[in-house]
Amino acid sequence: MRFPFFRNRDSVKNGILISIRRTGDGFHPGLFNDTMEALLDEPVHSAEDVGKLGIMAGDFVCFDPRTVVTKSGYIKSRFLDDKLSTCILLGYAKYLKEEQVQPKRQVYILITSYEEVGHGGAASIPENVEEMISVDMGCVGEGLGCDETMVSICAKDSMGPYDYQVISRMVELAKEQSIGFAVDIYPHYGSDVDAALKAGYDIRHGLIGPGVYASHGYERSHRLGAENTFRLLCAYTVA
């Protein structure tokens, strides 16, 4: 896996992330930190050599996303979790503006940078907000109903169940408008809405998003998953 290693725009070094035990059939996968190493594309042989390049603890490693959109509609890339949902929200805002559509209630769009570390939705929520819908990737995998072409409606995650009325209305709208959807439970999942509730906000909450396969790796989704998420978001806030 290729990546640039950087502190700022003026100091970028390239390299690869590679398995120490490259023959997967011959070794137990083990822990990530025990089986992976970062190789710089520079003639370095010691920690001192690396330090002379200006690289130090705390620098970022950003993988080459290798984005591909296939003719059949599949979207393959790193960071679909959660840039794909960000695109959906920006498309929703663009739709409201260009089509001069008035939502049935006041709507705020909050895009955070800290969802993955647990506190993205913990602040900056206006006082008059009564309900919050997190638009985040839906999981695709064994035992789940969602695939890449669907919008996932999450009934429960690691923090517990989402609001029953919100989820029920989402399902009702999806059925009425023939939106491809699945209702799933994600026991290891957390969202910005979870962070808001932990911060003390007394609000109704829901979670929807396009199906994404192989999250936190080289991920795959589909145009239909994004479209179905957009359609459900519009139906819920505008119709």
Protein language model regions, located:
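N-terminal hydrophobic/helix-forming segments and targeting peptides
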Residues: 1-239
